[in-house]
């Protein structure tokens, strides 16, 4: 049995297209010149279980849009042109288009995420069907997915191997600089406005009973705190969780891949995004996480099935050859040599010294003025409940040492004086909390004196 469209000579095996007992589960994304990676990204998210994939493109020069158009002709994805109004950036423009898109509005579940992000489900068999069974069993209508930052793994050279198999080294799960989120939720365009990290509840519903109906879980299947119904784009210590799922974020990949992207531009027009500071933030390789390999066989089968279509096959390999030709030209330049040297130096920045873009200063008075009555009442209730729990049982002592230290080769680190003892800020052995204490010179005295 095969999928065919009238007027098309090609066929794709029927097992590629997904259906779900939970209805329409839609991925919404934006792309610009992602040609070498499009088919892997599509194949992976079909393997995970999305029934529909809607991708907005702008200013592509490498065949990304042509591949997506062909996928739409085959009934496997939906391509939309991101027509950008003057003065608006591509990402917000695409979100506005998606908000008005009937296919998205008619979806039962929606997740907005980027082309360098791959959903990784630990729960059950790794499919959205099984995950949503568990979500709905808790009478929840959304789940908040925390980023897991994956680095280059020390890879410099370009490779055609799958992204999800090449890069298996990541930041420690308790590294809070990597706790941005994405949200899979039951979308109703009447109540919600789509956002890149999470949807925003429309103002007219804030003072109604509607917020009481919003029940979201964190990435470990525990209830999210009520404040997140209204604001926030990242996890905090009380809400972070990876037991059920995570969003693998491959922002840098290899040095060669990064070089291609640096001179390609990006979907959000951030001119200085691909620099050494960004590399040091995103090139985190402290621990191995190979959970994604659970999808390898299914993803490869779907990927190979997609390549049986001669049009997709031609477009895919043309995109690879185009990227490799551009890289070959660039690799002979002084600029490439300087880029490699700069990125290798940036890779040596210890995780404790990575500088992230500072968050926008919080104005408590402004926030209070914007808060709805429902949000204030909800927040006060949760604060009271936390105080009562703490009064009954004091907080557990923070975990400072990793249970399974990494056996990777030595990494660059700084040494800090703690109670007369010099300790290394070594992410292979200490948790993020422990590293913060070491840098501040406040690591627990009893533990410091008992370390080997």
Locate the predicted segments by residue.
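Short, acidic, metal-binding catalytic loop of nucleotide-sugar glycosyltransferases
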Residues: 43-52
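Short beta-strand/loop segment that forms part of the nucleotide-sugar
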Residues: 51-59, 80-84
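Catalytic-site signature of metal-activated, phosphate-bearing donor transferases
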Residues: 2-5, 9, 93, 123-349
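The conserved acidic donor/metal-binding loop of glycosyltransferases
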Residues: 114-118
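Non-catalytic N-terminal targeting/anchoring module and adjacent flexible stem/linker
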Residues: 1-19, 271, 276, 280-452
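Active-site-proximal specificity loops/subdomain of glycosyltransferases
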Residues: 63-110, 120-123
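N-proximal low-complexity "stem/linker" segments adjacent to membrane-targeting elements
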Residues: 1-43
